[in-house]
A protein has these predicted regions:
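Acidic donor-binding segment of Leloir-type glycosyltransferases
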Residues: 1-42
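Acidic metal-phosphate-binding loop of nucleotide-sugar-dependent transferases
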Residues: 14-17, 72-74, 98, 137
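Long helical/loop segments within the catalytic core of UDP-sugar-dependent glycosyltransferases
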Residues: 28-56, 81-147, 151
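Catalytic metal- and UDP-sugar-binding loop of GT-A-like glycosyltransferases, i.e.
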Residues: 39, 68-70
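Short aromatic/hydrophobic "clamp" motif used to bind/position activated sugar donors
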Residues: 65
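Donor nucleotide-sugar recognition loop
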Residues: 145, 149-163
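Catalytic donor-sugar/metal-binding loop of nucleotide-sugar-dependent glycosyltransferases
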Residues: 162-174
Length: 174
């Protein structure tokens, strides 16, 4: 990333078996901004992704949090582009797309996800965001703390993105 401000990369390993720890430690040898955290042996009422996100947010040293997923590719200017919107809102929703291949399922997934992103974009333009994707969103740590994190939605398997966005809207016009 070519962002010039304070930045850290927190990688949370949610019990993967793919050598994530070794990969991140190799990155850390070249760039001290990389941090490795693991949910192994972590006691929490949260499950899966929300448990991992909660750990990373707790350990984050900066106010603004920016999220993507391990299977996503971001451009070199991703942090710069998202941070341009920080002066306008405490919660920034980025658009994403699914990389498609020639299979029918892939094409269908791409269309389905594109429709979600179009709906999300439209609702944002009407100052009433309804949905977002956890693979491209950013919000302030203080907002997360103000809504008591994911605790209200801890029983849901998902919800770290759109449902969490709706929780945040209850306390602040985003």
């Amino acid at each position: 990333q070519n962002y010039k401000g304070n930045l850290e990369f927190i990688i949370i390993d949610d019990n993967s078996k793919d050598g994530t720890k070794k990969i991140i430690y190799n990155f850390r040898n070249e760039d001290s901004r990389f941090k490795y955290l693991s949910t192994t042996n972590l006691s929490s009422n949260l499950k899966h992704k929300k448990k991992a996100l909660d750990l990373g947010i707790d350990k984050a040293q900066y106010e603004w949090l920016l999220f993507t997923d391990v299977d996503c590719r971001v451009k070199d200017n991703w942090v710069n582009e998202m941070s341009k919107h920080y002066k306008y809102s405490d919660y920034v929703i980025g658009l994403s797309r699914v990389e498609e291949n020639k299979s029918f399922v892939s094409k269908f997934q791409s269309i389905d996800f594109s429709m979600l992103m179009i709906s999300a974009s439209s609702s944002v333009s009407m100052n009433n965001p309804l949905a977002c994707s956890g693979q491209n969103q950013s919000y302030k740590k203080s907002i997360f703390e103000k809504v008591n994190g994911f605790n209200e939605i801890s029983d849901l398997l998902q919800g770290d993105d759109s449902i969490f966005l709706q929780l945040c809207q209850k306390i602040k016009n985003i």
